[in-house]
From Swiss-Prot:
InterPro entries the record matches: 6-PGluconate_DH-like_C_sf, 6PGD_dom2, G3P_DH_NAD-dep, G3P_DH_NAD-dep_C, G3P_DH_NAD-dep_N, NAD(P)-bd_dom_sf
Gene: gpsA
Pathway involvement of the protein, from the record: Membrane lipid metabolism; glycerophospholipid metabolism
Subcellular location: Cytoplasm
Known catalytic reactions: sn-glycerol 3-phosphate + NAD(+) = dihydroxyacetone phosphate + NADH + H(+); sn-glycerol 3-phosphate + NADP(+) = dihydroxyacetone phosphate + NADPH + H(+)
Name the UniProt record assigns to this protein: Glycerol-3-phosphate dehydrogenase [NAD(P)+]
Family: Belongs to the NAD-dependent glycerol-3-phosphate dehydrogenase family.
One term of GO molecular function: NAD binding
The organism of origin for this protein: Serratia marcescens
Catalytic residues (UniProt): K196 (proton acceptor)
Domain of life from the UniProt record: Bacteria
Binding of NADPH, residues: S15, Y16, H36, K110, A143, R260, V284, E286
Length: 340
């Protein structure tokens, strides 16, 4: 690919990165898609679709494939990073030497930093410096529906108001099929995407056990309370968690089997082991690592998160899923409102 002036460079050619690239390109924006595996990029270029994840969605003509990172980053000042959270920092450090002087970074990665549990904004600042504008996309988005052009809405938060406006009114203005809501709460929009992964595993476990819709709904509601408590402790606006990046994403991933986290939880509830369930999914289950990271973050903040604690016990301490659920049901009585 010769150097071009693109509206956006997308880093990460998995299902979600490809779906976002298709969505932007379909709506008239020039988009460059880069992936870490040159052979994969060559295959995508040959097939003009992502056979592995989105085989029924052809690439628009304005979606360009690039295997050379330097050329991909030279094509646009705006860079959308869509990679798993446990490699987020490594990828940003890989990008830094090749970024344009006027570069701006937005990510659609959901989660916290592996091992440390830090918000991704802190990882980005450490990797890229204090001056580069940053933004985050988060909300209820399944890759297959997004790529198919089905109506989707998402939240956008940025460190720079002009950057947020440029994205919302510019390359992320995609007609009626993809609606972007701006939100000034940079912390809350990031956090919602991490905590919902954990609660989705719990919802799947509940359904795998066979506890039914009542239990699932109670778990979602109390999971939202945990999300809000942790967010408030970190300085987020609690109202953010009633929006796309909170309740919206939480309901989606807890109730639909397109969610890898939910399917993973269902298998655990049915008695499968953690490794067996992960192998069956065949893709990254973000909630597995997120559970450890979210719990550690909550403990540092002194925030009680009993659902997250029990999911951690199942994932890392070999506790039976049914026993974990019964532990939650057996907790001391509490008033609902003060704990929210």
């Amino acid at each position: 690919m010769n150097t071009v002036n693109a509206s956006m460079t997308v880093i990460g050619a998995g299902s979600y990165g490809t779906a976002l690239a298709i969505t932007l390109a379909r709506n008239g924006h020039s988009v460059v898609l880069w992936g870490h595996n040159p052979a994969q990029i060559q295959t995508l270029q040959h097939d003009r679709c992502n056979q592995a994840f989105l085989p029924d969605v052809p690439f628009p003509d304005t979606l360009l494939l690039e295997a050379d990172l330097a050329r991909a980053l030279a094509a646009s000042r705006d860079v959308l990073v869509v990679v798993p959270s446990h490699v987020f920092g490594d990828v940003l450090r890989q990008l830094k030497p090749h970024l344009r002087p006027d570069a701006r970074i937005v990510w659609a990665t959901k989660g916290l930093e592996a091992e440390t549990g830090r918000l991704l904004q802190n990882v980005a600042r450490e990797a890229l410096g204090e001056t580069i504008p940053l933004a985050v996309l988060s909300g209820p988005t399944f890759a297959k529906e997004l790529a198919a052009g089905l109506p989707t809405a998402i939240a956008l938060a940025a460190t720079d108001a002009q950057f947020a406006d440029d994205l919302q009114q510019g390359c992320m203005h995609c007609g009626k099929s993809f609606r972007v809501y701006s939100n000034p709460d940079f912390i809350g929009v990031q956090l919602g995407g991490a905590v919902k992964n954990v609660i989705a595993i719990g919802a799947g476990m509940s359904d795998g056990i066979g506890f039914g819709a009542n239990a699932r709904t109670a778990l979602i509601t109390r999971g939202l309370a945990e999300m809000s408590r942790l967010g408030s402790a970190l300085g987020a606006d609690p109202s953010t968690f009633m929006g796309m990046a909170g309740l919206g994403d939480l309901v989606l991933t807890c109730t639909d089997n397109q969610s890898r986290n939910r399917r993973f939880g269902i298998m655990l509830g049915q008695g499968k082991g953690v490794q067996e369930a992960q192998d069956s999914i065949g893709q990254v289950v973000e909630g597995y690592r997120n559970t450890k990271e979210v719990l550690a973050l909550a403990q540092r903040q002194g925030v009680e998160m009993p659902i997250t604690e029990q999911i951690y016990q199942v994932l890392y301490c070999h506790k039976d899923a049914r026993e974990a659920a019964l532990s939650l049901l057996g907790r001391a009585r509490k008033d609902e409102k003060p704990s929210v």
